[in-house]
Amino acid sequence: MPSASLIKEFEQLVGKENVFSSEADRQSYAYDAAVLKPMIPSLVVRPTEVEQLGQVVKRCYEEGIPMTVRGSGTNLTGGTIPDCSDTIVILTTGLNKILEINTEDLYATVQPGVITAKFAAAVAAKGLFYPPDPGSMSVSTIGGNVAESSGGLRGLKYGTTKDYVMGMEVFANTGDLVKTGSRTVKCATGYNIAPLLVGSEGTLAVTSKVTLKLIPPPKASKAMMALFKDMDGASQAVAGIIAAHVVPCTLEFLDHASINYIEDYVKIGLPRDAGAMLLIEVDGHPAQVEDEAVIVEKVLRDNSATEIVVARDAVEKRSEERRVGKECRSRWS
């Protein structure tokens, strides 16, 4: 446990309500979504201002105290589980402001505690699109997405978080502020540090600000579900779709075991006798979407799909994709 004087210092810095020292509070931050051995930290501190974050990091460094950075803790890698009982957990959920959405230059700047789904919705309200859609996006944070290089159903066509990070501001373990990247499409100035930080699970620096690329949204989309007797047919269908030069924005594969585990867990009406299932979505210009949907359906039938179901509308499409995709990853990731 940190000294009483250090705890008091943190309470004065971030407010007593943002320092958690009781055993019950600390136990809540001993684990994350990964099924790994928990470790109770010595203290949990939640800064609400960037300057506070830098000071907390600096004081931990000066006192020789290990740090673990945490957002919502939805990761499946154990990245937010403390390494030892002396660790102080630094919560970034208090830094949750969307600082800018630039509709002219197509970027946004946010703090690490911003919830992914709220950010995507704010961007959509401005007529733009932020594609990365991890299954936990309703509760995950942008900082956590960057730390894990998170991706989701749209990853095949649109990529993952790493493809949208333009720049970052982070605190080194000493508490020094480091700025990397820029808000321009082309930036060859200085070392390209941001790609090293993305996916580092908070082991290299503590994120205080992220600049993310935005794109125009697709004008139309169409989603479908295809069932197969076995995995071979589904695998061949995937290869056939790509070989036909169609890159779906969603292409999710479930084998027989996954289908049944998910159905046991959430009971959403998945066909238990199916050997494999594909969730597919194409998007883009309306004419392109119709053409690609026809090609995809033909490839599916040519590879012995036993059933093809096309979503009736956008609400049904996203609801089914999100439920199935989220449960698939949560059970098997």
Whereabouts are the PLM-identified features?
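Noncatalytic alpha-helical scaffold of FAD-dependent oxidoreductases
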Residues: 1-326, 331
